[in-house]
Amino acid sequence: MAEQLKELAEMVESFGTAPTMGEMPCRTLATKGINGPTAAHVIEEIHTPFNLAYVTFTTGSTAFQNVVGVTHSEIDGRVRASLAAFDMANVERHGKFLVTYAPLVNVFSAEALKIHGLDWFFLQRSSRDAFLLSLCQEKPNVLIGESTFIRSALEDASVLGLSHSIPQGVIAFTAGTPLDLDLLQVAEKHNWKIHDLYGCQEFGWLTLDGVPLRADITLIPSPKGSDFREFVVGGLPMADSFPYAESGHVCNPEGKIITYRRARTNPEYEVIVRETKLSSKETTERVARTILRIKGRVVKVDPALKVSSTKTVLDLVPSVSAEGKSTSESYRIEGDDKTFLFETLIEAQLALQQTAKTDQVWKKTR
């Protein structure tokens, strides 16, 4: 028996196909490009499936944050949107980019920052005084942060007699909360250019100064009123509504989506898949479950789903009306251009199924 155990141990050590703990690949905060401090998080190591490029969390202070999975197939779209934002804001390559909140890098994806040649860095501490210190000492060309946080720091600089040390002509992306309009006047004293960047951890950056950064963005009627539009990306609703104004965004008159007047959509839209280019209803149902799990969006599959269609057809339906009753009102989104993100998640699902486990040990059905 002892000899048999010895042989088994040698086989496990020398010929095992599964990795040991030391052989497992590892993604650290540094390899993800987000190795900066925050006051709202604990650093935790987790086992992340290979089919996800990375895991992050939604932001928010009034409800628990959702875990967000970003698939490998989504990275190209995030990169294109991020590079479009840099181009629109005239961000030069190889500049110094101060990121005041490390998880914001996940919205760009570190790949986008690398492609644009930016040298990004973080605060020593996640605090206003550390931000002010970094501005004065590091002299960034570009930065991103919450608008009121930035405004307060610039006002602090004036009170402390440090205004002369603030770098001039900084390009400042504001994100995370609706734009604090008072920042515009404060920033003007330092010849800063303020940009209102809207997006989320789930889908990346979506607009800059009210101008869409992706081709698959659609605006549909919102229950918030006739002046508002529900924001939809790639066929998936954001649950955010914005005024649409021909007068334009305060940072750019060409931008018609007034992102600094955001309102939460209530009731939220659900997505019904009516037609798919997939040949299998079962795969479509798996895509719906995937989107719920990693993006937090409710997608349902029509029992009469048309498979092997020439296009994807999605209906967005409020779960209940404003009066609390069910409603049949829906808004249709179809075609490759407007359902691109949905198609990207289908691509991710198909890639997952190609590497699906066949060993009966892992089957959840018998």
Curated annotation (Swiss-Prot):
The keyword Cell membrane does not apply. It catalyses: holo-[ACP] + acetate + ATP = acetyl-[ACP] + AMP + diphosphate. It comes from the Bacteria. Transmembrane segments: none annotated. It is found in: Cytoplasm. Its EC number is 6.2.1.35. The keyword Ligase applies. GO terms for cellular component: cytoplasm. GO terms for molecular function: ligase activity. Keywords: Cytoplasm, Ligase. Acyl-carrier protein (ACP) acetate ligase of the biotin-dependent malonate decarboxylase multienzyme complex (EC 7.2.4.4). Involved in the conversion of the thiol group of the ACP-bound 2'-(5-phosphoribosyl)-3'-dephospho-CoA prosthetic group into its acetyl thioester using the energy from the hydrolysis of ATP. This is ACP-SH:acetate ligase. It comes from Malonomonas rubra.
